[in-house]
A protein has these predicted regions:
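Conserved, mostly hydrophobic/aromatic
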Residues: 31, 67, 101, 144
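A structural motif corresponding to the C-terminal end of an alpha-helix
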Residues: 20-31, 57-60, 92-96, 129-142, ...
């Protein structure tokens, strides 16, 4: 949406998704919209971008994927304000639309728009923020997908870290 503004970008995204939904109507597949780091002209950092698309299209095949690193990078403080972040998400998007969580730590500082995933508990989000998200009554029963670096060699380490966070 370069040069057109956020509203125009959201409108164009909704139009494109409507075409995708129409062309795949017989397949019954769902499309998950994922929050972004709000890098440059990318849509999806502010929750209202996704909320506006869902509101415009009103299609049950559209769901939302919440990425913990992306939220942190976009400035949503999961450590100090998880309740506020979830409340804002609910107001802008609706928690009923949340289908899955990409679970990862992040290398960048809060609000720096850096899309660099990190091993669980080793990044700038930290264990307390991740523990809060993993165990929160509004999110704990959702599917969590690990999206950490070096999956081939580090998956066991990250699974162990998640188990430790879940046990507390």
């Amino acid at each position: 949406h370069l040069g057109s503004g956020e509203e125009a970008g959201v409108e164009r995204l909704a139009q494109s998704l409507q075409i995708c939904l129409e062309k795949t109507a017989d397949l019954g597949v769902k499309i998950a919209l994922e929050n972004t780091c709000a890098q440059g002209t990318c849509l999806g950092g502010p929750f209202w971008h996704i909320g506006k698309v869902l509101q415009k299209l009103q299609n049950p095949r559209l769901v939302v994927c919440f990425d913990s690193c992306h939220a942190h990078a976009a400035g949503h403080d999961l450590g100090e304000n998880l309740e506020g972040v979830l409340s804002d998400f609910d107001a802008q998007i609706g928690l009923e639309n949340l289908a899955v969580i990409h679970f990862n730590d992040g290398k960048g500082a809060l609000g720096k728009h850096l899309d660099r995933h990190e091993h669980i508990g080793e990044g700038q989000l930290g264990k307390a923020a991740l523990r809060g998200l993993l165990n929160h009554p509004k999110t704990r029963d959702l599917p969590f997908i690990l999206e950490t670096p070096e999956v081939e060699t580090q998956i066991a380490k990250n699974i162990a870290a998640v188990r430790e966070l879940r046990a507390v």
